[in-house]
Amino acid sequence: MSFVIATFYHFVKLSNYYDMKDEIKVACDNVELKGTILLAEEGINATVSGERNAIDKIFDFLRSDYRLRDLTWKESAAEYQPFSKMKVRLKREIVNLGVSNLDTSVRGQYIDPDYWDDFISQPDVLVIDTRNDYEVKLGKFKNAINPHTQRFRDFPQWAESFSESKDLKVAMYCTGGIRCEKSTAYMKSLGFNDVYHLKGGILSYLEKTHNKSGNWEGECFVFDDRIAVDHSLAPSDKIKCIFCSSKVSTDELKSVPRGQVVCSDCKSLSIERKLEFNTNL
């Protein structure tokens, strides 16, 4: 059996998001979806997985709400169900930047994946990766700036210390688009004028371009049991252990915590070394 993995987000004011939780959970359970949906006043953010018919039905349901009628999503395939449960959670933010009263309606301009390579090749464009450091280590765009953040909440502090001219063009990207979209709103609030972001993120770029230019280097970390995907969006078979750099098997990948790609041999490391690693996440 094959499964469809759908990722989506939408920044839109949902004043009644508390009331939406139960009805969305019931709709997902009725079609046996698994995954996580986050709801906040600023919008919705989710990754869900199920059979083809289930995915179609849940989006018909969600888009019946006029505020979500423009909802779009990205799909990939898996041979196994990457999630064990269906969770619908209420949050202050759909992606946690930790900045109060940020107006996400004032944000950067989209760059379509088809034009991304040409855009970032311009000499006056700075490319910024808004993902966490452990994600960047698996793969990134050539010449992209790595802020070396351990979590998304670290990004504002890095951005405030960013010394480049606010008149330069800034092109930002992330996995699926949500972090870079919110980051552009923050950069705009700091006074950066020309701010852009990759529409749909790395996953859309790889889906549309198949990395023909070679600008993408490595694998793309994803937040499910696949751990990472290659340029064709297939589960990666090239992931290496963060301790010894040996290749990590598919079975081992299914059981690792987020950001901790560890082979079987290194799982027997001393407690002290594991604790040292964990404190750096």
From Swiss-Prot:
It catalyses: uridine(34) in tRNA + AH2 + O2 = 5-hydroxyuridine(34) in tRNA + A + H2O. Keywords: Oxidoreductase, tRNA processing. Signal peptide: none annotated. The active site is at residue 174. Residues 121-214 form the Rhodanese domain. Gene3D superfamilies: 3.30.70.100, Rhodanese-like domain. This is tRNA uridine(34) hydroxylase. Belongs to the TrhO family. It comes from the Bacteria. GO terms for biological process: tRNA modification. Disulfide bonds: none annotated. It comes from Wolbachia pipientis subsp. Culex pipiens (strain wPip). GO terms for molecular function: oxidoreductase activity, acting on paired donors, with incorporation or reduction of molecular oxygen. Catalyzes oxygen-dependent 5-hydroxyuridine (ho5U) modification at position 34 in tRNAs. CDD domains: RHOD_YceA. InterPro entries: Rhodanese-like_dom, Rhodanese-like_dom_sf, TrhO, TRHO_N. Its EC number is 1.14.-.-.
